[in-house]
Amino acid sequence: MLALLLSLGIGGLFARSIWTLREEAWNNAERTNTNLVRALDRSIARTMEAFDQSLQGVVEGMTDPRVMALPLAMRNLALFDNSLRVQGVGSILVLDPAGNVVMDSEHAVPRKANFADRDYFKVFESGAHTGLYVGAPVRARLSGLLSLPVSRAFYDSQGRLAGVVVGTIRLAHFQGLFEELNVGAGGALNLFRADGVLVARYPYSEDVLGRSLAGTPTMRNLQAARSGTFTGRAALDKVERLYAFRHVGDYPLMVNVAQSVDSILAGWYRSAWLSGSFALVLMAACVGLAVLDRKSVV
């Protein structure tokens, strides 16, 4: 009986030790992912803030008669100078009420194009939105680069739409941020619009950019709080991951760091197997010695 109790005690101690190792591995992953997503949040928020300030500067200039009275070269410099300092930014365009390009940050004589069909123009044309608008990721019509469009409208003295200022942030900028981080085998990094549209992802796949994941369990968790962690199975590749997420400042964007559960527990699986095997050997030895001792007494 004593040998049985001793072997059970050994088994209990090892089981507790194995479970403690699992908790430590999990808690360490949560802390690491939370720190990573906080760093991404700050970086993306800084980019968005600087870019929005540039757009607001163009809006203010377009409604300032003194700026609009300047010679063309000076006017372009006054309107677009700040945008040149924002990392990852493409061109900034000013569209008239019909969606035609009337001013262009990259060309003194604006390129001919119409964007009346784009969501970032139509939301202001219909009066459905005010303030900053973040569009769905698109391949820019003029540059051909995958970009995230961001726009603001300006109005005449009667409150009617006078035009839209739209600029783009190259998706390669976000990909560059993601590729600097190591989330292990099976890990993923995602930037979403608040409505569930995928803006950028690591590992990179152009096919999924712009896809809406609204209504999926993962998206419902992301939208339920400003920040946090949860475990879930990804809608895109069905991999079970630990997610750490944050909403980006006051912008309609969410970023997450997702580490695969298998990657988090890989080291623990090995330790658990070794410790468990050793515990079984000790338990068997205790029972075996007890049996031998009993036989010698008999």
What function would you assign to each model-found segment?
Residues 83-91, 97-181, 185-188, 233-235:
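Extracytoplasmic/periplasmic ligand-binding sensor regions of membrane-associated signaling proteins
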